[in-house]
Structures are given as C-alpha cells and as structure tokens.
Amino acid sequence: MVHAFLIHTLRAPNLEDTGLCRVLYSCVFGAEKSPDDPRSHGAERDRLFRKEQILAVARQVESLCRLQQQAAGCSSTDLQPQFSAEPVSLHEAPHGAFHLAAGDPFQEPRTVLWLGILSLGFALVLDTHENLLLAERTLRLLARLLLDHLRLLTPAVSTGAAYCRAHPSR
C-alpha cells in the first residue's frame, strides 16, 4: 500500500546551504496517530504530526540525492532547471530506495522510493512488502506526466502570445 506521495525541492550538490528543503505537495493516504499518546489529539495536531513525518522523508531523500550526485561527480548545475527544448531523461535521473525503521518517523517500518529530476524530488512512501519494480514504474510515470503538464508554465513558452495567435479577434 502507498502511504504517501510527495514532491519537494532539491538543492544542488556542492553548494552551500542556500535554502531549506521545501515540500511542495504531499498526499497522505490513511492516518497515523502520535506514538506518544493513544488518545485523539485533534485534527490540527494530527496534521502537524503528518507534516513533520513528510518533511523528515523529504530531507532524507534530498540528502541521499545529493550524496548520489556527489559520488557520481556531477556538477552543481545538474539538478538546476534547464529551459531548453531537449526532453528530460528520466532514466538517467538520480533515484533510489531506502528503508525507514519503525518509529523513524512512522510507527510501522516503511520503504521510500525516490526520484530526483531537475530541482524536484518525487517520493512514494510504501509498505515494506510492496513490489518496488511496479512502484518505480508508477513513480516515473507520475513524474513524467507532471513534468509534461508543468512544461506549459516554463518561461520558454509564451502562453499569452500563443493565446493571441489562436484567438486573433480578442
């Protein structure tokens, strides 16, 4: 079962800490109560608890991605956005999986599958017994579809000019 999907920022390797890892989007499937107290804490406290869990996963993904890039000897610009007509290769993108022990940060053990593309990290938080090959294909498909959709928002595309050409009377 997939427990969470998240998209977050990735800082380039070999750079000073110029910013924090930021979670741009997350979706948690199911709820986990705080391990300290079995009583209900209320919606706000549960939301903050889930937010902390997701941020912990994002930081670990960012750390592993930076480590992999540094070990491969990649330059600091490899994870920066590239506004060109060339498609982004998902097969060459840094990726990996790691295991989270029970209590770190989830109550049950989990597996995290991640993919780093440009300056974005995509991650799935899974049960430990999930099919990782199927999950990796799903994560790559999600990332490709999201990047294709977001390509409309890049500075290289002038949506206003395209709209004016398509609707000359307006």
Swiss-Prot record:
UniProt-annotated location(s): Cytoplasm, Cytosol; Late endosome membrane; Lysosome membrane
Domain of life: Eukaryota
InterPro entries the UniProt entry points to: AP-5_subunit_s1
Record's bilayer topology term: Peripheral membrane protein
GO cellular component: AP-5 adaptor complex; AP-type membrane coat adaptor complex; cytosol; late endosome; late endosome membrane; lysosomal membrane; lysosome
Residues passing through the membrane, by range: none
Any Pfam family matching the protein: AP-5_subunit_s1
Keywords annotated in UniProt: Cytoplasm, DNA damage, DNA repair, Endosome, Lysosome, Membrane, Protein transport, Transport
Main location: cytoplasm
GO biological process, one term: double-strand break repair via homologous recombination
PANTHER family in UniProt: AP-5 COMPLEX SUBUNIT SIGMA-1
Function according to Swiss-Prot or TrEMBL: As part of AP-5, a probable fifth adaptor protein complex it may be involved in endosomal transport.
Subunit structure, interactors included: Probably part of the adaptor protein complex 5 (AP-5) a tetramer composed of AP5B1, AP5M1, AP5S1 and AP5Z1. Interacts with ZFYVE26 and SPG11.
Name assigned to this protein: AP-5 complex subunit sigma-1
Organism encoding this protein: Mus musculus
